[in-house]
């Protein structure tokens, strides 16, 4: 996941970008630790203007990001439910400027492609 963020940062070429990150599955007892490490790493990308997280364990990504950043950067967490997905899509469309660089990444089990498909309609 960190490699994907690095690529998004390179593609942004000094401009702002946004990330929508979901749970990393099958981490077992290391899940909380790895999600928090990812949140810390996200905070180090100075051009990452906004972070949305989706799913149960992804909360720790957002929590760590919030601890280490300040405005004008923002983040918001959504539960990994159909209602949470609908709220994420609605909030994203209201907030993120058209044409922005966006990374959407999660374990396959989260089905984050539903988010991407909704944007392509």
Short names for language-model regions:
Residues 1-121:
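ATP-dependent carboxylate-amine ligase
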């Amino acid at each position: 996941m960190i490699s994907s963020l690095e690529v998004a940062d390179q593609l942004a070429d000094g401009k702002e970008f946004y990330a929508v990150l979901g749970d990393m599955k099958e981490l077992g007892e290391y899940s909380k630790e790895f999600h928090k490490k990812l949140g810390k790493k996200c905070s180090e990308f100075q051009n990452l203007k906004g972070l949305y997280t989706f799913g149960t364990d992804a909360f720790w990504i957002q929590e760590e990001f919030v601890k280490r950043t300040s405005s004008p950067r923002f983040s918001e967490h959504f539960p990994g439910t159909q209602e949470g997905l609908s709220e994420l899509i609605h909030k994203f469309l209201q907030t993120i400027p058209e044409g922005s660089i966006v990374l959407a990444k999660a374990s396959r089990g989260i089905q984050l492609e539903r988010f991407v498909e909704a944007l392509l309609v």
